[in-house]
Regions:
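Short, C-terminally biased terminal segments at protein or domain edges
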Residues: 1-48, 55-146
Length: 146
């Protein structure tokens, strides 16, 4: 599996693209504030999911990047609230994007609570030579031995 196959990534990418399209309609004066911020945070959700999955051989890094992704997802929701309050998006769009945002948050939290289902093997990480070799073999082949 590759990170693009992860449901959290797919859903996060989908909402980031929807936000991009919606934000094209924001006023020009918001270009370097709300528009830039909401695009950046929504894209960062996916970037952090990708990084966490690629670095899943390091359990702490996996966890750290997923918590960063969750924080970016919350930031995106905050920007959606501002866009709605400023009347840049209508209520229907706000509700749809909010529901999708919540779903992405749940998927990220599922990954955080179930790291083994995503290939994180914490039993490998004791400081000895055998595990160091195994860790580097996993990185080289991009697969975890069964």
């Amino acid at each position: 599996m590759i990170y693009q196959d992860l449901l959290a990534y797919k859903k996060g990418f989908e909402i980031a693209m929807e936000i991009f399209e919606v934000s094209k309609l924001f006023p020009k004066e918001e270009t370097y504030s709300l528009t830039d911020q909401i695009r950046r945070s929504s894209r960062s959700v996916c970037a952090n999911i990708a990084e966490s999955y690629r670095k899943r051989v390091y359990p702490k890094h996996f966890h750290s990047k997923l918590t960063d992704s969750d924080a970016e997802n919350s930031e995106t929701q905050t920007w959606l609230e501002f866009a709605f309050a400023c009347k840049y998006i209508n209520e229907n769009t706000f509700k749809e994007l909010t529901e999708k945002n919540k779903e992405v948050g749940k998927l990220i939290n599922y990954m955080l609570l179930n790291p083994a289902k995503f290939g994180v093997k914490t039993e490998y990480w004791t400081p000895n030579t055998e595990n160091w070799i195994l860790k580097h073999e996993i990185l080289k082949t991009n697969s975890i031995p069964k």
